[in-house]
A protein has these predicted regions:
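Amphipathic alpha-helical scaffolding segments comprising HEAT/armadillo-like alpha-solenoid repeats
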Residues: 1-7, 31-40, 141-151, 174-187, ...
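Structural detector for internal amphipathic alpha-helices that build alpha-solenoid repeat scaffolds
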Residues: 1, 14-26, 131-136, 158-175, ...
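Short coil/linker segments at helix-helix boundaries
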Residues: 34, 41-91, 115-142, 178, ...
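Short coil turns that connect the paired helices of HEAT/ARM alpha-solenoid repeats
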Residues: 5-14, 135, 150-158, 186-194, ...
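Conserved acidic segment of CheY-like receiver
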Residues: 230-252, 280
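Conserved phosphotransfer microenvironments
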Residues: 279-306, 312-321
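Short hydrophobic/Thr-rich beta-strand motif most characteristic of the beta2 strand and flanking loop
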Residues: 255-263
Length: 500
């Protein structure tokens, strides 16, 4: 405190002189350059999590914080990582006050504030942007963009996420539209789910009307989020189905679903298309590509590069080789192949420990999906946003029809897609008598819009099938016959229009 008071440019001169007097009285007052150098080193270590403290061993830490509103110190219980970043924020603030003219001092001060604020708010809630802007001395959107870039470079995921949340409120098209990918788009490629969503959400809020580098990633991540089923899963790759079955049985009680593949190609496709997969298990039985090549491919892909991977070794010789291969590699562990429930549960627990410090909850998955569906609907009907080519993600969007909360939006999206697959899917939905009639009527509306936009894309056989469905519905409720008759009227009206 005396050091800050004696060196801070914000301290009134009499107080600075008094603090310097007491420092000299107690011993030699350090030079400003010495203080800056030491603080700089400590801030960087705290920020990057390289400075271990006694509190690191505790689950909760008591810290005293000054509340500007109440004008008094308040006791808070926080997690050790939050306490470490709080300490970094305090030190960085001192560093900045000592020499506010240093660009690096300001950058570390603001980065540490972002890192701390995000760890304090948690993954599911946005930081208090006004609080950050108040501390940031008229920061510009361009400077926030620079902070995002530096946070990505330093792997400060929380700070990067917070920077995206700030850009959502203060950013503009200049932070997105470019012939080179801007940091907001690059943030999607880092591979952290919460950071990906924060970047997407900011871009969706800014809503540029001009094509830009990396726009395809934005549309893809939106369709990926939207296809979530809100249940975390692990993916198991092995040529024997009983291995996947054993993992499915053992992981269920721990809240995990399970999917499997018996080839490297299918495993990669599954891992990069299912947004609910969070842990990967790869057996050395998979070939073409080999287990190690598959790992390299997954580490290179923006959806899977940060996922924990467990390598399953078939015997002791392969286990030893795999342990040597994974030594010192982040989020990569080796296990002996086992069908035992307890052994699998233990392996899963170790992989969970390799996950991001903030997990993705079912509520998070739903929130990400809902925001993405909202944006996809608006992008699909806005001709200014045609450059996103929403139709190229049609396969992932078809299933949204069967999710009650998203049926209406999915129908409107599919209505803009002049494809046989979209029309066939809508007719299949309308024809299912066990679905709510209100939802079927919504999709019938969308089918009519689709035909008006691009004509009928169905084959003669598919149209005949629809007549058969109508004829078979004579014993079903009247509203079912009505909605089935309506889509036939739409088809016939189009036919008659073409004959004229």
């Amino acid at each position: 405190m005396l050091l800050r008071t004696s060196l801070s440019q914000r301290t009134l001169s009499p107080y600075r002189e008094l603090a310097s007097y007491h420092l000299n009285k107690s011993g030699r007052a350090p030079l400003q350059s010495e203080v800056e150098s030491r603080l700089l080193h400590r801030v960087e270590k705290f920020l990057e999590g390289r400075r271990e403290t006694a509190e690191s061993l505790l689950e909760e830490v008591d810290v005293w914080m000054w509340n500007d509103d109440s004008r008094q110190l308040e006791l808070m219980e926080v997690k050790p990582d939050v306490a470490a970043r709080l300490r970094a924020a305090e030190l960085a603030r001192t560093l900045y006050e000592i020499n506010p003219g240093s660009a690096r001092n300001r950058e570390l001060h603001l980065l540490s504030q972002l890192e701390y604020l995000k760890r304090q708010s948690g993954a599911s809630d946005q930081i208090k942007v006004d609080q950050f802007l108040k501390q940031a001395d008229n920061i510009s959107a361009s400077e926030v963009e620079g902070l995002l870039s530096e946070a990505i470079k330093l792997d400060l995921i929380h700070a990067a996420t917070a920077a995206c949340e700030v850009l959502k409120e203060v950013g503009g098209e200049a932070q997105i539209v470019s012939s080179d990918m801007r940091p907001l788009v690059n943030a999607i490629l880092v591979g952290d789910r919460h950071l990906q969503f924060a970047a997407f959400d900011a871009i969706a809020e800014i809503n540029p009307k001009i094509a830009y580098a990396g726009s395809s990633y934005v549309a893809e991540v939106a369709a990926w989020f939207a296809s979530s089923r809100f249940v975390k899963k692990c993916a198991v790759g092995h040529i024997r189905s009983e291995v996947a079955q054993a993992w499915s049985i053992a992981t269920g009680p721990r809240g995990w679903g399970s999917v499997s593949a018996d080839s490297s190609k299918d495993f990669f496709e599954q891992a990069t298309s299912d947004p609910d997969i969070g842990i990967l298990l790869i057996s050395d039985s998979l070939q073409r590509p080999s287990q190690r090549e598959l790992v390299r491919q997954l580490r290179s892909h923006w959806k899977t590069r940060r996922m924990p991977i467990g390598l399953l070794a078939r015997d002791a010789d392969h286990l030893i080789k795999s342990i040597r291969y994974t030594e010192g590699m982040d989020r990569l562990l080796t296990f002996p192949l086992s069908l035992d429930d307890d052994a699998i549960a233990s392996q899963l627990k170790q992989l969970e420990g390799q996950e991001s410090t903030w997990t993705v909850s079912s509520d998070d998955r739903y929130r990400h999906a809902a925001r993405s569906v909202e944006w996809l609907e608006s992008a699909a009907v806005d001709s200014d946003l045609d450059y996103y080519h929403i139709g190229s993600h049609q396969k992932q969007l078809l299933g949204l029809l069967y999710h009650p909360e998203f049926t209406s939006s999915a129908a409107k999206i599919l209505a803009t897609q002049p494809t046989a697959v979209a029309q066939r899917t809508m007719l299949g939905f309308v024809s299912q008598g066990d679905l709510p009639i209100e939802a079927r009527e919504l999709v019938a509306d969308a089918f009519e819009d689709a035909v008006k936009r691009g004509g009928t894309m169905l084959t003669t056989r598919e149209i005949q099938l629809q007549y058969e469905r109508y004829n078979a519905s004579e014993n079903q409720p009247a509203e079912t016959q009505k909605v089935l008759g309506r889509v036939l009227d739409v088809i016939e009206a189009r036919r008659n229009q073409l004959k004229q």
